[in-house]
UniProtKB/Swiss-Prot annotation:
Binding site residues for Mg(2+): 205, 231, 257
SMART domains, sorted: MR_MLE
Entries under Gene3D superfamilies matching the protein: Enolase-like C-terminal domain (3.20.20.120), Enolase-like, N-terminal domain (3.30.390.10)
Binding-site positions, D-arabinonate: 207, 257, 278, 307, 334
A Pfam family of this chain: MR_MLE_N
GO molecular function terms attached to this record: magnesium ion binding
Protein name per its UniProtKB record: D-galactonate dehydratase family member PC1_4063
GO biological process terms held by the UniProt record: amino acid catabolic process
Keyword check for rRNA-binding: no
Transmembrane segments: none
Similarity section: Belongs to the mandelate racemase/muconate lactonizing enzyme family. GalD subfamily.
Known role: Has no detectable activity with D-mannonate and with a panel of 70 other acid sugars (in vitro), in spite of the conservation of the residues that are expected to be important for catalytic activity and cofactor binding. May have evolved a divergent function.
Length: 399
């Protein structure tokens, strides 16, 4: 096979709507351009610097065909590895290289991987409100759109406490009360089942807001309401507690969006302490490690539910679709509708049809970026108040 030489790499940060989105563009001497998602929205300029200052000089002039070799070189070239900045930067290039390979072969990615395992992947979206009546409206809107898996949150992560027993002069932050959150969320599950029965699957994201002993209590309490899964019931640093939760509750557990390093998931998968893995594909380094992770999890009965929040590009979401159509143990795909400006910047963005995401038949990833439109929306820093999470006494807690 003739070489396909990398001639240029560009990293573009754009903020068309609420989130800063990072896209890597790889150009070649064959006139074929690849696109990848490298979004780390809290630190986008750090990723851009990694691509522009370090990966571009390393890769320009090399053969884009050798993805496996280039991935390993990018990952180890700095010696220190497997962190959110380097992994997202590597992932953006990795996805773009796979995009180029698919375009060279004139095949969509899922065909390049080996073809499909299913006709479509079930999607779930988010219903949230401060009140049950508002939540019901959101649920019914999504149900009418065809969703049969709906993530339900009463209030934002950690709930919105009706009353907060706060200190005299509270430090600025996003406050929540764990006890109120548990009580309100258990009541939410009960109300949803009483109103809707089993018409749809309920998912819920704890988002690491509980201490380990509270997580055990919560899992036992919600099991009777048959959630499809409970997400991030613990922060990664406390995942050894999953064995205790497992021993006391059959509630399905999902985790992984914060994982960077294979060491963070290997024992959880081998010991079958989770049911679904929720890795963020760019956070673990791109398509190359995601394919290996999928095959590894299949050996232990762990299913795939890739993280797909609104703070990633439609390019990254399309990569998830290709992985899910191909990988046999894919279970479900998160999806949040794109705002108008995001669709303008990514005009090929894919959306569900009656609750399913279908294969993308265009060559490569099948979703690119309108560079002129993207440049109309420059990066804007924001302090990300929701990650400044505090308990009633002012203690900072995992967001």
């Amino acid at each position: 096979m003739l070489p396909t030489i990398i001639t240029d790499i560009e990293c573009l940060v754009t903020r068309p709507d609420r989130h800063n989105l990072v896209t890597v563009v790889v150009r070649t001497d064959k006139g074929i351009t690849g696109y990848g998602c490298a979004t780390f929205q809290q630190r986008p300029l750090a990723v851009k610097a990694m691509v522009d200052e370090y990966l571009k000089p390393l890769l320009v002039g090399r053969d884009a065909n050798h993805i496996e070799d280039l991935w390993h070189m990018m990952m180890v070239n700095a010696y220190w590895r497997n962190g959110p900045v380097i992994n997202n930067a590597v992932a953006g290039v990795d996805m773009a290289l796979w995009d180029i390979k698919g375009k060279l072969a004139d095949m969509p990615l899922y065909h390049l991987f080996g073809g499909k395992s299913r006709d479509a992947i079930a999607a779930y979206s988010h219903a949230a409100s401060d009140t049950l009546d508002g939540l019901y409206q959101d649920v019914e809107r999504l149900y009418t759109q065809g969703y049969r898996h709906i993530r339900c949150q009463l209030g934002f992560y950690g709930g919105n406490p009706d009353t907060l027993h706060s200190t005299r002069q509270p430090t600025e932050g996003a406050y929540y009360d764990q006890d109120q959150y548990m009580a309100n969320t258990i009541a939410m599950f009960r109300a949803l089942r009483e109103k809707y029965g089993d018409r749809f699957h309920i998912l819920h994201d704890v988002h690491e807001r509980l201490f380990p002993n509270q997580a055990v209590q919560f899992a036992k309490a919600v099991e009777v309401y048959r959630p499809y899964f409970i997400e991030d019931i613990l922060p990664p640093a406390q995942n050894e507690w999953l064995a205790q939760i497992r021993s006391q509750s059959a509630v399905p557990l999902a985790t992984g969006e914060l994982f960077n390093n294979p060491a963070e998931w290997q024992n959880l998968v081998i010991n079958r302490q989770i049911d679904f893995i929720r890795c963020h594909v760019s956070q673990i380094g791109g398509i190359t490690p995601a394919l290996k992770l999928g095959a590894f999890c299949q050996n232990f009965g762990v299913r795939l539910a890739w993280h797909c929040p609104p703070d990633m590009t439609p390019i990254g979401a399309a990569v998830n679709i290709h992985l899910n159509i191909h990988l046999h143990n894919a279970a479900i795909q998160e999806f949040v509708a794109y705002p108008e400006n995001t669709r303008k910047v990514f005009p090929q963005a894919v959306e569900p049809e009656n609750g399913y995401l279908y294969p993308i038949e265009r060559s490569g990833i099948g979703v690119g970026i309108d560079l002129d439109a993207a440049r109309q929306f420059p990066v804007v820093y924001r302090p990300h108040e929701w990650t400044q999470s505090r308990l009633p006494d002012g203690t900072m807690h995992t967001p």
